[in-house]
From Swiss-Prot:
Keywords on record: Amino-acid biosynthesis, Aromatic amino acid biosynthesis, Cobalt, Cytoplasm, Lyase, Metal-binding, NAD, Nucleotide-binding, Zinc
Protein family per UniProt: Belongs to the sugar phosphate cyclases superfamily. Dehydroquinate synthase family.
Designated name of the protein: 3-dehydroquinate synthase
Any one cellular-component term (Gene Ontology): cytoplasm
Listed EC numbers: 4.2.3.4
Source taxon at top rank: Bacteria
Organism: Neisseria meningitidis serogroup C (strain 053442)
Subcellular location(s) per record: Cytoplasm
Molecular function terms from GO: 3-dehydroquinate synthase activity; metal ion binding; nucleotide binding
Cofactor note: Binds 1 divalent metal cation per subunit. Can use either Co(2+) or Zn(2+).
Principal place of residence: cytoplasm
Function field: Catalyzes the conversion of 3-deoxy-D-arabino-heptulosonate 7-phosphate (DAHP) to dehydroquinate (DHQ).
Length: 359
C-alpha cells in the first residue's frame, strides 16, 4: 500500500492506494469516520462491493445504512441528489454522520455535494471504484451535479476526510470505462510531466492489462500531481485550472451529445487533442506533438477526434464553461508536451480553424 497526504487550507487528509484495501476499509478509515456512516453507491457497484464494505465497517464497530442510486452520468442531477437527501433524512442522519461514496466519479461528485450541503456540512470519505475517480475526481474536493445547459455547473469545493483507492476494483470495470479513466492518466503527463508521458508511452499495454506494479505507480503519480496542485490552489484561482486540460472542449461534447453518450474520459481524450490543435494554431507546439498525443490516447482505446456538430453549438456550450471570465473564453493549452498554459481566446476564428475538420 502507498499513502500520500493532500494538504489544503481547509484541512489535510490521506489517500490510501493499493490492492486488497476494501476489506480493510473499516480499520483504515475508522479514524476519519463518525460513529455512524451512510454508504452512497449505485445499482452496478452495490452487488460487487457493498457487502465487503459493510462487513469491514461492522468489524470496526461503525454502524451504517446504505442508499443505492441509479447508475450513470444521466442521473447526475437534482432528482438523484434528492434521493440521497431522502435517504439521509429517513435514516435520521445527523451532522456528524459520515457519508461514504462507494463508486465512480458520478457517485463521488454527488455524495460530496450532498455532504457539503446536508445540514450545512457533513463529513464524507471517498472509496473510488473506477480508474477515472481513483486518479482524478475523488481527490481535491470538487463536487457537483450537472445542469441541462452545462456539466458540473452546480457544486461546491468540499474536501473529503480520506480517500481509499483499492485497485482490485478495477478488475470488474468494463473495458470502455478503463479506457475512459486512462484519458485522465494521460492528461497528467501531458499537462505537467513529460517523463511521466514518456513512461506511459512505454507501459500502456501493461497498464491496460492491469498489471499490478505499473498500475499502482501510475495511480500514485496522478494523485501526487493533483495533490501538489490542489495544495497550491484549492479553489481554482490559478494553476488548478491546468487540470482542466481537454475539459472545455470535452464538456461541450458531453453536453451536445447528451450526458452519458460519450463517457467523460472519452470526451476529455478528444478534448485534449483539440487543445493540442489549438496550441498548434497559436504556434506553441508542432503537428508532430499533437500526433504523438493522439497516438498515446488511441493506444489506450480512446477516441482522438470529436463527433461532428455545428461550430455555433461548440461556441454555445463553451460559453458556459466555468473558466469564462468577463465574457472571455479561457482554454488550457500547451506550451509543449508536459507543460500546460492558460490561454485566453478572443478571436473565434482560431477556434473555427481548430475545429474545422469536425464541423
Amino acid at each position: 500500500m502507498k499513502t500520500l497526504t493532500v494538504h489544503t487550507p481547509s484541512h489535510s487528509y490521506p489517500i490510501f492506494i493499493g490492492n486488497g484495501l476494501l476489506p480493510q476499509a473499516g480499520s483504515l478509515l475508522k479514524p476519519h469516520l463518525g460513529k455512524r456512516a451512510a454508504i452512497i453507491t449505485n445499482e452496478t457497484v452495490a452487488p460487487l462491493y457493498l457487502g465487503t464494505l459493510q462487513t469491514a465497517l461492522d468489524a470496526a464497530g461503525v454502524s451504517h445504512f446504505s442508499i443505492i442510486l441509479p447508475d450513470g452520468e444521466a442521473h447526475k442531477n437534482w432528482q438523484t441528489l434528492n434521493l440521497i437527501f431522502d435517504g439521509l433524512m429517513q435514516n435520521r442522519a445527523e451532522r456528524k454522520t459520515t457519508l461514504i461514496a462507494l463508486g465512480g466519479g458520478v457517485i463521488g461528485d454527488m455524495t460530496g455535494f450532498a455532504a457539503a450541503t446536508y445540514q450545512r456540512g457533513a463529513p464524507f470519505v471517498q472509496i473510488p471504484t473506477t480508474l477515472l475517480s481513483q486518479v482524478d475526481s475523488s481527490v481535491g474536493g470538487k463536487t457537483a451535479i450537472n445542469h441541462p445547459l452545462g456539466k458540473n455547473m452546480i457544486g461546491a469545493f468540499y474536501q473529503p476526510q480520506a480517500v481509499l483507492a483499492d485497485l482490485d476494483t478495477l478488475h470488474t470495470l468494463p473495458a470502455r470505462e478503463l479506457s475512459a479513466g486512462m484519458a485522465e492518466v494521460i492528461k497528467y503527463g501531458t499537462l505537467g510531466d513529460i517523463s511521466f508521458f514518456e513512461w506511459l508511452e512505454q507501459h500502456m499495454p501493461e497498464l491496460m492489462a492491469l498489471e499490478r506494479a505499473p498500475l499502482i505507480q501510475a495511480v500514485y503519480r496522478c494523485c501526487q500531481m493533483k495533490a501538489d496542485i490542489v495544495a497550491q490552489d484549492e479553489t481554482e484561482q490559478g494553476i488548478r485550472a491546468w487540470l482542466n486540460l481537454g475539459h472545455t472542449f470535452g464538456h461541450a461534447i458531453e453536453t451536445e451529445m447528451g450526458y452519458g453518450t460519450w463517457l467523460h474520459g472519452e470526451a476529455v481524450a478528444a478534448g485534449c487533442v483539440l487543445a493540442a490543435r489549438l496550441s498548434e494554431q497559436l504556434g506553441k507546439i508542432s503537428a508532430a506533438d499533437t500526433a504523438r498525443l493522439a497516438a498515446l490516447l488511441e493506444a489506450a482505446g480512446l477516441p482522438s477526434a470529436p463527433p461532428v456538430f455545428a461550430f455555433e453549438k461548440w461556441l454555445e456550450h463553451m460559453s458556459h464553461d466555468k473558466k469564462v471570465s468577463s465574457g472571455v473564453m479561457r482554454f488550457i493549452g500547451l506550451n509543449r508536451l508536459g507543460e500546460a498554459v492558460i490561454t485566453e481566446i478572443t478571436d473565434t476564428d482560431i477556434l473555427r480553424r481548430t475545429l474545422q475538420p469536425y464541423l
